[in-house]
Amino acid sequence: MASYKDVKKVVLAYSGGLDTSIILKWLQTELGAEVVTFTADLGQGEELEPARKKAEMLGIKEIYIEDVREEFVRDFVFPMFRANAVYEGVYLLGTSIARPLISKHLIDIAKKTGADAIAHGATGKGNDQVRFELSAYALNPDIKIIAPWRDWAFKSRTDLLAFAEQHQIPVAKDKMGEAPFSVDANLLHSSSEGKVLEDPSQEAPEYVHMRTISPEAAPDKATTIKVGFEKGDAVSINGVRMSPATLLAALNNYGRDNGIGRLDLVENRFVGMKSRGVYETPGGTILLTAHRAIESITLDRGAAHLKDDIMPRYAELIYYGFWFSPEREMLQALIDKSQEHVEGEVTLKLYKGNVMVIGRESDKSLYSDKLVTFEDDQGAYDQKDAAGFIKLNALRLRTLAKRNLVK
């Protein structure tokens, strides 16, 4: 707390919920600081006006509520999907990719309002504290960062509720007890963790899933869609061009209705522990499959394999919070270069939790009917050439075998 004694003005990442409302009041009462709130519309599906009204009720004069959905998808989600990024083989990084955007706006607002600190509501056990703070320091190395969950004296939900009552912070009746699990959501995904999900041997209750119907309840008839790409980014569905956020929202609807995008994962957190999360990424799951399909006919083999080699490192950088690091930007430049000719359309069949590629076409396709046909290729490929190719590639293996067979 001593390091905060000179803080006069703080920009708080504010959701309007109980926890960040308590943080807001704590900053006012314990630090005596003026608080500025920032609430981002990331497509989480919540009304944001209540956050404004609650901030006003708590005496806040400077309130920022910004619709960042297009920026989120255009500048963060789409660049990540150009890389086909997944953490530990399956996680589409829906929470991770939103944190640098929030930090960017916190820093921008701090500069605009003359604040000397920012604050967030991430706990001291999770990855988000790292992501928020690494991003903030990358953009302003001198900013002060306040993380109340690491500093305050509250030990339980009861302590928080008592503080709320003492300071007349409204508490909804359904918030009086501990929530059965915690939720984070944005336009790309929703994640649920904790409480009823902490035993990884037990199936998650169906009520945890808020973005998708169960695959068993999905329609018995498949849905077929076409996704169009330009320079590696999705630009259209069924021939209709859309903005990035509008397109992702539309894919979410297709995924939701067909039970697509559920993931039950035990992951390795950056801070060292394992955690179990239940994720729903309906549109992102469709997008990843479609992007890999269009790359399959437009990327050269060497470029495709190099991308696959660097992808785990790129995904790890995002998961750990290094979006604004030079190494992520270097990898991004390589990835973006690879996408110059990644354009065309992919036809997908969506059915009971599955995304199946049934067609792909591109004016920049490297797929040659003449080369792969089982019929007469009219001299496009001389099969006799394969003998020399194989013999040269076998040279080291034959040399090794001769040595090893000597007794």
Swiss-Prot record:
ATP binds at A13, Y14, S15, G16, G17, L18, D19, T20, S21, A40, G121. Gene3D superfamilies: Argininosuccinate synthetase, chain A, domain 2, HUPs, Single helix bin. GO terms for molecular function: argininosuccinate synthase activity; ATP binding. It is found in: Cytoplasm. GO terms for cellular component: cytoplasm. L-aspartate binds at T123, N127, D128. One of its GO terms (biological process) is argininosuccinate metabolic process. It catalyses: L-citrulline + L-aspartate + ATP = 2-(N(omega)-L-arginino)succinate + AMP + diphosphate + H(+). SUPFAM superfamilies: Adenine nucleotide alpha hydrolases-like, Argininosuccinate synthetase, C-terminal domain. It comes from the Bacteria. L-citrulline binds at Y91, S96, N127, R131, S182, S191, E267, Y279. Keywords: Amino-acid biosynthesis, Arginine biosynthesis, ATP-binding, Cytoplasm, Ligase, Nucleotide-binding. NCBIfam families: argG, PRK00509.1. HAMAP family: Arg_succ_synth_type1. Homotetramer. Belongs to the argininosuccinate synthase family. Type 1 subfamily. This is Argininosuccinate synthase 2. The gene is argG2.
